[in-house]
Amino acid sequence: LTGGWTPRPSGNEAWSQSPSSGAFETQDGLLMVAANNDKQFRALCAGLGRPDILEDARWKEAPCRAKNAPELRAELVRIFLSRPALEWERVLDEAGVPAAKVRSLDETLAEPHAATRAFTHTMHWDRQPHDFHVPTLGFKVDGEVIAPTTPPPANQALKPYG
């Protein structure tokens, strides 16, 4: 917002453009991995059970990894396809590598953290056959969740337009 530049869309790839970061297919879905620096890359190789990758001249140093990115990426894809995303999430977390299964909205909202943070608020509106959920703000004020308490005033807002 204050840097004077607008980032370009990067799709599923990490902003760092590191070949060992970004979205990887697993047996059952996507896994986001952020192994952007040498320390994280070494931890990634250890977590994958593939310390031999570090001995390959194509990938030993960061500039070499960048130069040989397609080959490294292909090797990592082959490895990640061998297990489910949640298993990789656990293994890489233990290795100290930032990584997480890409969850659907339903999966995300079912996480204990989402309930603790009260990411949604249940509302009742007599025009709806059942209660519905709306998002709250991502923070609390004086320990309280900030959430809408009444439905939007649609009729009032649209009345001037017919």
Language-model segments: what does each one mean?
Residues 1-11, 105:
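Substrate-binding/catalytic subdomain of NAD(P)-dependent oxidoreductase enzymes
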Residues 2, 42-46, 106, 139:
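Generic alpha-helical structural context detector
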Residues 15, 19-95, 99, 161:
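Aromatic-enriched alpha-helical interface/lid elements that frame and gate functional surfaces
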Residues 22-26, 120-126:
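Short acidic-hydrophobic surface loop/beta-edge motif
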Residues 38-39, 107, 146:
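Short, glycine-/Ser/Thr-/acidic-enriched flexible segments
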Residues 93-114:
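Conserved PLP cofactor-binding pocket of PLP-dependent enzymes
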Residues 114-120:
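Short low-complexity, flexible loop/linker segments enriched in glycine and/or proline
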Residues 124-162:
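Flexible, small-/acidic-enriched active-site or ligand-binding loops
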